[in-house]
Amino acid sequence: MPESASTARIFSTDHFVLPLPPDHRFPMAKYARLRERVAAVAGDLLAVPEAATPAQLALAHDPAYVNAVKAGTLPDAALRRIGFPWSPAMIERSRRSAGATVAACRSALASGCGINLAGGTHHAH
């Protein structure tokens, strides 16, 4: 479906999977299952979001924190708060999740509805 100002969108980031240990408490697989169920009833509304830009991240995050996350130099205590082991995939997933929120907000402003299926997996510091 071509995007237009009046088209609601549903943004999914389940394609950006974190490499987690088998015993990790985070249920990563639920996002793919959710997208599959949404696709069955509204697949034409699904979209993969762009990654949040550095400028967008700077609106909600301390630049030193963003740089430390990107470089993989966060202290162990900060990584424990995040709850995920550092990896390039964690950076991409986080940027896509934040980008999905931005995109869903823009969709809601334009069409009255925008949904981020990955909401809740990103936490600002």
Can you annotate each of these PLM segments?
Residues 1-125:
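HDAC/HDAC-like amidohydrolase catalytic core signature
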